[in-house]
Structure formats: structure tokens, C-alpha cells
A protein has these predicted regions:
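Active-/binding-site microenvironments in catalytic and ligand-binding cores
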Residues: 1-161
Length: 161
């Protein structure tokens, strides 16, 4: 029986041949992963803690696993609209209700790493977006706009925050 060609099989083939690039933007989690510090009057988000359940020992002789405890805003994450008061009444405002297809799309990268390296409080403005579009073309609906700062190279809480 011949295999059926589907959009998914074509995507997989293009990925395997290196014609499409998927970029993993996640950062490793660890004890030094930065966590936002809020004023003391607000509840704090915990950092990452890992507790070993078993490590090939009497608690589990053939496996290694852990309990991981962290706030939902620790490390690389997505804020659903419901996270902010402005999104609490929107339809499909939680991660389980947002169609998965909305999380995948072509990306446009505005590289301001030099500026962010020179000015820690550098802000992306509409003028940066318009300049990028002037050089690369209009950002299409459904595209992701990524703002490159190279802050991912900063290690530890002090350097990042």
C-alpha cells in the first residue's frame, strides 16, 4: 500500500532535509533561573526547586525521576490573555482553549541585540518595526514578531534582572 502524502508528511520531510528551520527558544531551567521580583505587598512567584524521588536506589532501583516545583512564570513561558485583567473576559483566553495552530507560524526577527547591549533599558518602538518592514517587507497576519536582545546570554538572576 503506497504511503499517503499529507501536509504533515511534507513538513516532516522538509524538516529532515533542512529546508525548514524550527528554532527552540526555551532556556534551560535551574536554581539560578531568573524569577520576577514583585513589591513585597504582592504574592511572590517561587523559583525552581527540584526534589529527587528516586535515583536508581531503594526508592526506585531502575529509574531516576524528580518532583519539580516552580511558579508558572518561571523560565520560558507564554502568558495567556487571562493572565492580565484586560484578558479575563475574552473568549478562548486560557492556554487550553487557544487553538494550537495559533502557536505556530513564520517568524520575523527584529535584532536589537547591539542596542540592548548598550542600553539595559532599551525599548522596541513602532519605528523599529516600521524600519524592519521597510527592509524586509510587511509583517504578515499570523506571523510571530520576535525581538532579539541577546539577554538569553545573561546568566543568573543578577545579570538577567
Amino acid at each position: 500500500m503506497p504511503s499517503r502524502v499529507t501536509v504533515l508528511s511534507l513538513l516532516v520531510e522538509e524538516l529532515r532535509q533542512g529546508n525548514i528551520q524550527v528554532v527552540d527558544l526555551t532556556q534551560p531551567l535551574g536554581p539560578d533561573t531568573p524569577v520576577i521580583d514583585l513589591p513585597p505587598i504582592f504574592a511572590a512567584s517561587p523559583g525552581l526547586s527540584i526534589e529527587t524521588i528516586s535515583h536508581y536506589d531503594e526508592k526506585g532501583p531502575a529509574w531516576y525521576w524528580n518532583t519539580i516545583h516552580l511558579g508558572e512564570h518561571t523560565g520560558t513561558h507564554f502568558d495567556a490573555p487571562v493572565h492580565w485583567i484586560t484578558g479575563k473576559d475574552l473568549p478562548n483566553n486560557t492556554t487550553d482553549r487557544i487553538p494550537v495552530g495559533r502557536f505556530v507560524g513564520p517568524a520575523c526577527v527584529i535584532d536589537c541585540s547591539k542596542e540592548a547591549g548598550l542600553y539595559e533599558d532599551f525599548l522596541l518602538t513602532p519605528d523599529h518595526v516600521l524600519a524592519w518592514e521597510g527592509e524586509h517587507g510587511k509583517i504578515q497576519p499570523g506571523s510571530w514578531l520576535l525581538f532579539r536582545t541577546d539577554w538569553s546570554k545573561r546568566q543568573g538572576r543578577e545579570a538577567f534582572l
